[in-house]
Amino acid sequence: MSPEGFGEPQGGAPMSQIANYLPDSAKVAASLAERPGVAAVERAAALVADALAGGGQVLFCGNGGSAADAQHLAAELVGRLLLERPAYRAVALTTDTSVLTAVGNDYGYAEVFARQVEGLGRPGDVLVAISTSGRSENVLRAAATARARGMAVVALLGPAASPLDEAAEVALHVDGDVAGLVQQGHITIGHALCGWVEQRLAAGR
């Protein structure tokens, strides 16, 4: 697969890029049952469900496409995914432009998530830290702040070991060659996690 993740064009036809990319996407999706594996996703989902059942909340953070994923998954919890049920407490730390720019201006971009975790996070809450590299400084600082406040950390990561693994109670790795494929895996895992949480809380477990 090429560095762009679309394969080499055959005969200059743009359609060949799609023909290469879609099978690669399907391979990543099919690999998730092995890595990170069903048991690991269930462990992460249990942390989220326990936090919500105890009156806590789930905070999400990430950069770029991972910021969009953070907002997507927070919306699934506040809204609904599969079941009609009460709203769950979930916040994406990527959405308040006034907070992001104020903290970025006063403390630096590396603190834009950690400062929010410090203000909003409580013991028993969960931070879902999303990073394809596992090396984004602002995500690492958010995870460190969360652990210092007695929160659990779930990390959605790419294929390689990273510093974020060390801060996470559960690290969920996706074996994708490029960021876009990893992010697709993150959303698939996120949907599975949110659906599991809904089922568990609906059953009162």
Task: List where the protein language model places each region.
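Generic N-terminal amphipathic, Lys/Arg-enriched alpha-helix
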Residues: 2-35
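Glycine-rich, small/polar surface segments that engage phosphate groups of diverse ligands
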Residues: 23, 47-121
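A short, well-structured juxtamembrane/interface segment
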Residues: 33-54
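Short glycine/serine/threonine-rich phosphate/pyrophosphate-binding segments
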Residues: 66-71, 135-142, 164
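Short beta->alpha connector loops at strand-helix junctions that form conserved
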Residues: 94, 131, 157, 172-180
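A charged, well-structured terminal subsegment
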Residues: 119, 181-205
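Short, well-ordered beta-strand core segments
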Residues: 127, 153, 170-173
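Short, glycine/polar-rich helix-capping loops at beta-to-alpha or helix-loop-helix junctions
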Residues: 156-168
